[in-house]
Curated annotation (Swiss-Prot):
Disruption phenotype: Cells lacking this gene accumulate tetracycline (TC) and abolish the production of chlorotetracycline (CTC). Its EC number is 1.14.19.49. The lineage of its organism: Bacteria, Bacillati, Actinomycetota, Actinomycetes, Kitasatosporales. Pathway: Antibiotic biosynthesis. This is Tetracycline 7-halogenase. It catalyses: tetracycline + FADH2 + chloride + O2 = 7-chlorotetracycline + FAD + 2 H2O + H(+).
């Protein structure tokens, strides 16, 4: 008798309520929520913990949604991932800090121009973000899920999935079976459910193209030590205090340090490169490491930053990484997060997207389990959200790769993305605040009531601006206009915008570093109070005292 069969026998052959394939962060957060609310959950995974995983960088919106699902569903361990300080205190000291998104523009053989950099400091109103050392965060949530009552099988290879009117049967390579009322596949690219049901789109509808080479390194210097920047052009916080993006024509490189704070105990740094495979075809004549260094050597500042670095784990080199699925929900199943599709680590949206899907799926799935009604229609919004998250992020990243050959065009992409991220994050934060104040979950459910599921700022005026951005970038890509002309039009739109948070400098293309201090956020709140757009008033208007309290600063 296998362990899995034994688990079900102890419960009188009663099926599990939900079987979750994949015990990474998405599977274990969902499993913890469901088990906390009294449902029987089985986690299946072909690997084990601790283990390496990608998705190490968080964003402000990730922190807010982590807090929201923790409070909404009563799982405090999830909130322990929602700030740098809480991760250090509750998970481990192996994580890095992330105070900012940093972008540095590069050309072959040239030093970077200090006037061609962009930094977006994460607003303290949402907290301090972290660089997740995923083997620790994932193991932490796995053990939390087990404590809440999830059963788990590691090293479990799924061979077959069979649905019938009463539920689902998962068969393992070891001959065991797991019976459940519902299945969630939270695995990844090699999703057993996507494979068996033929859900992968071939070819993918996604526009973005990139392949990847990555590893963990020691000996990575701070880029701050290797660029000569006049004092007046330096960013408000060091580049090394956050995630560094070295951007260049049709590609970018990430530097994600875990050792960038005084209490650091982890010497590692996550390093990788994304390359449009149409511009940079794979080099089978080179090892992954050799190919990586061939690109590092193109850019003098990056070469200096990595001069003393060496890899401490095997290199990974992929083909094109983008994939999508024709459906993500069905009768008694859901294909979740990276099992459904993937775009690119640019903008660090992976974990944020995962949390949004968990938030939308959890209450619907619990209601379906209680009512024994798994009609696909009740999960329709989850499908819309998953597909929307893929499609909007695909456009954003594709626009960015197009703009990476022309800094003024990239400058507009950066502003239109980052300004809306502040507004969209505040929308979620407001729902969390009102829910905590009233105990009324309708404020959280209202987040689902928007016309553009998956768009980080689902408001009409932002969609209009983003659509124009996409149209112009795609026209550049098709050769119908020049990057210079597209940049000129977008710069004018940015300057004339009535919603782009003027106190932060988003509508001034010469303000390269966005630093949301308390004084600036108070000015934004005052500006919003009399704004002609009701959405701006509703989302951003506040008193100076409320802003200071939210940012934890004294008058």
């Amino acid at each position: 008798m296998t362990d899995t069969t034994a688990d079900q026998t102890r419960h009188g052959d009663r099926p599990y309520d939900v079987v979750i394939i994949g015990s990474g962060l998405s599977g274990t957060m969902l499993g913890s929520i469901l088990a906390k609310h009294g449902f029987r959950i089985m986690l299946l995974d072909g690997a084990h913990h601790p283990r390496f995983a990608v998705g190490e960088s968080t964003i402000g919106q990730t922190l807010v949604v982590l807090r929201l699902i923790s409070d909404r569903y009563g799982v405090p361990e999830i909130a322990n991932l929602a700030s740098f300080q809480d991760v250090l205190a509750n998970v481990s000291s192996s994580h890095g800090q992330k105070s900012n998104f940093g972008f540095m523009f590069h050309r072959d053989g040239e030093e970077p121009d200090p006037n061609e950099t962009s930094q977006f400091r994460i607003p303290s109103i949402v907290g301090n973000a972290a660089h997740f050392f995923r083997q620790d965060t994932d193991s932490y949530m796995f053990h939390a899920a087990v404590r809440y009552g999830c059963d788990a099988r590691q090293y479990y290879r799924v061979e077959n999935i069979e649905f019938d009117d009463g539920g689902v049967t998962v068969s393992g390579a070891d001959g065991s079976t797991v019976r459940a009322r519902y299945l969630v596949d939270a695995s990844g690219f090699r999703s057993p459910l996507a494979r068996q049901l033929g859900l992968r789109e071939e070819p993918s509808r996604l526009k973005h193209h990139a392949r990847s080479i990555f590893t963990h390194m020691v000996g990575v210097d701070a880029i701050d030590d290797h660029v000569d920047t006049p004092a007046e052009l330096r960013p408000p916080v060091p580049w090394n205090d956050g995630t560094m993006h070295h951007i260049f024509e049709r590609g970018w490189m990430w530097i994600i340090p875990f050792n960038n704070h005084p209490g650091a105990t982890n010497p590692l740094c996550s390093v990788g490169i994304q390359l449009d495979e149409r511009r940079y075809p794979a080099r089978p004549d080179l090892t992954p490491e050799e190919e990586f260094w061939s690109h590092v050597d193109r850019f003098p500042a990056v070469q200096r930053q990595l001069k003393g670095a060496r890899s401490v784990r095997e290199w990974v080199r992929t083909d094109r990484m983008q994939y999508s699925s024709s459906r993500t929900v069905g009768e008694r199943w859901c294909l979740m997060s990276h099992a459904a599709g993937f775009i690119d680590p640019l903008f660090s949206r992976g974990l944020s997207n995962t949390c949004e899907i968990i938030n939308a799926l959890s209450w619907r799935l619990m209601a379906a389990l209680r009512e024994d009604d798994f009609a696909v229609e009740r999960f329709a919004y989850v499908e819309e959200l998953e597909q929307g998250l893929l499609d909007w992020n695909d456009k954003l990243v594709n626009n960015s790769f197009i703009s990476f050959s022309h800094y003024p065009l990239w400058n507009s992409v950066f502003r239109i993305w980052a300004s809306a991220s502040v507004i969209g994050g505040k929308r979620i934060l407001n729902a969390l605040t009102r829910t905590k104040e009233t105990g009324d979950d309708s404020h959280c459910q209202a987040l689902d009531d928007n016309p553009y599921p998956g768009l980080w700022c689902p408001l009409d005026f932002y969609k209009e601006a983003f659509d124009e951005l996409t149209e112009l970038c795609e026209a550049v890509d098709a050769g119908h206009t020049t990057a210079e002309e597209a940049a000129r039009v977008l710069e004018q739109r940015v300057r004339e915008s009535d919603w782009m948070l003027p106190a932060l400098g988003f509508n001034d293309p010469d303000t390269h570093h966005i630093n949301p201090t308390a004084d600036k956020m108070i000015r934004i709140a005052e500006w919003a109070t009399g704004h002609h757009r009701p959405e701006i008033r509703e989302l951003l208007a506040a008193s100076a005292e409320e802003v200071r309290a939210a940012m934890r600063v004294k008058p």
